[in-house]
């Protein structure tokens, strides 16, 4: 039943989800946003005046914290209705869980958040919920993305893995955090600032130090791991950061 529901919603998911997001979307692949991130980093490195930042945001148990009531409201907002919506409501109507301690099942307790593990619907429902934050980020004029020709690039997303590309990080970071906090109050979404990593691009060390003082994120000096790929601060290091380490690992395995 849930697989049938997932197949049905996938027929309409591109109407709901922006092309910035690729995870669990028909015809979209993870390497699309890897290539996009590399292009953005390469573009920034060629700019004469640098005042930019890329942030890889680490969400805290994002699937587990999704609020059911908010999820249902968002499904209604994107015109999911009728029998389909009623079935999803039934799936998430007063779910409970038990803890088994020393072989004994303890009293059931209610679950008010979290998409169901292993359910083919879960990543699709999560995508729809997170699109609210993604849309708000795109539409927020105080958050400046990276201007590449006629397009302003702000986001890349794969499920809960998100990269944000911004200009004027000293002024914009507060707006980004406020937006996430407001979304988190209703959706249950939180980021782990200490595990989130950022590349800073400035023209001088003084500016970089001033920006670092305002950031709750860790600033990376060489690379950020995203979807299993090491994105280097400078694109010329792509080969060394990825292929050389992979070749060494293969050689070590074959020589054992």
Q: Could you tell me what each predicted segment is?
A:
Residues 1-256:
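Nucleotidyl polymerases of mobile genetic elements and RNA viruses
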């Amino acid at each position: 039943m849930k697989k049938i529901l997932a197949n049905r919603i996938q027929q309409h998911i591109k109407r709901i989800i922006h092309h910035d997001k690729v995870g669990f979307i028909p015809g979209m692949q993870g390497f699309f946003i890897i290539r996009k991130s590399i292009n953005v980093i390469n573009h920034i490195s060629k700019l004469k005046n640098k005042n930019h930042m890329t942030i890889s945001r680490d969400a805290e148990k994002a699937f587990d914290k999704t609020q059911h009531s908010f999820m249902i409201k968002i499904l209604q907002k994107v015109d999911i209705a009728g029998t389909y919506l009623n079935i999803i409501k039934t799936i998430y109507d007063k779910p409970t869980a038990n803890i088994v301690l020393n072989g004994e099942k303890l009293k059931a307790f209610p679950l008010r958040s979290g998409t169901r593990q292993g359910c083919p619907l879960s990543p699709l429902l999560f995508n729809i919920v997170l699109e609210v934050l993604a849309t708000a980020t795109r539409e927020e004029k105080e958050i400046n993305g990276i201007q590449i020709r006629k397009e302003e690039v702000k986001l890349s997303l794969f499920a809960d893995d998100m990269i944000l590309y911004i200009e004027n990080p000293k002024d914009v970071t507060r707006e980004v955090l406020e937006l996430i906090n407001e979304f988190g109050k209703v959706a249950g979404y939180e980021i782990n600032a200490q595990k989130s990593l950022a590349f800073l691009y400035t023209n001088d060390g003084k500016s970089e130090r001033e920006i670092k003082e305002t950031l709750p994120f860790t600033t990376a000096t060489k690379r950020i791991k995203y979807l299993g790929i090491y994105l280097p601060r400078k694109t010329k290091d792509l080969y060394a950061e990825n292929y050389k380490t992979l070749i060494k690992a293969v050689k070590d395995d074959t020589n054992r």
